[in-house]
Amino acid sequence: MDFSIKAFNTKNAITQHKSSCIAVGVYEGGKLSHAAKALDLKGALGAALKSGDITGKPGTTLLVHLSSGLAKRILLVGLGAQDNVSDRNFTSAVQAVARVFATLGANDGMLALPLDCVTGRDAHWALRAEVIALRESVFRADGLKSKKDDTANGVRKVTLAVDVADAATKRALAQSVALANGMDLSKTLGNLPPNIC
């Protein structure tokens, strides 16, 4: 899985980013995150909230197909209460995104969850949580199988939305990918039989 970061601000709006699927956050009580509000130009996301199709509870998802715009699909993801998004709720939301991304018939996707919403954590921690959860979802221990699992489907290129794409954020992404690589290697070695490892 390939990761990249993209900063969105007033000059570079999220509505101008072309993607097969953009995952945005929804809070309990029917509140859209900033990215979701920006993408809700025709009111489809707000209507989905009002209809009760998604509650905003952590890990709940709703895929909305769009007929126009640069994004073909918007994935609404529940984050829990807006004033108290815990580590667990955020990780649960990212794992839910990973499950949906694995089933999509698309090659690219974007995570635009609010990185600064997690209580007691910074944006770099949230970035690391996103990378690790997405990489865990695609890990397969099929190195010794005669017929490997078919994993061709699903999102393979993920863009992570950030507020600022400075050197510290790029370093945090590189460290997150390195950590995920180490976790994959540990799992691979742990799954090998004793006569090989």
Locate each region found by the language model:
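Short amphipathic alpha-helical segment within the helicase RecA-like ATPase core
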Residues: 1-197
